[in-house]
């Protein structure tokens, strides 16, 4: 079983432009792919899946009407998530990481918290969403936390374990496979920089709304193929 797959679901807006649709429709189609992955992937092949739902730049630099649509869509999607039978029959725990408590409207915060609380005792699989998240901001906050701890306790040993415990992702294992859709073969704003230090990367030109479960399976097959080569 793969312990942890992270997905940067890029290309929703490009898909919308190509198909003559609105950005909102692009995000909606992307959510359909997320649903498909959730329904099919937690079958004993993957333990943890993390989706990057919104960066800080997404929330700060995009037009306000688009940001408000994002908030509305997140609220709708998370409510729908809790109705999936797979979430409950497969005991999938939902986590939401990032600065959503600082940035999101209260109603959306309430919906997110309900999803977290409703699944907190599930332990077979973990479904994580990064919302209001940038990797460089995560690391800056970790450094600030460690600095404050060191001031309070000069004898504190600063090591890799302490850094990990200071991250949003402190309860998650390192990322084994990072998938990025949308034809952008690079990382962005330090995405999960600590947890992807030894990850395999899988880049595809396919925009996320066209990233079917078949394409997801291809990424997993390639990951295992690379692993076999490395083991020789």
In which residue ranges do the predicted regions lie?
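Flexible, compositionally biased loop and terminal segments
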Residues: 1-232
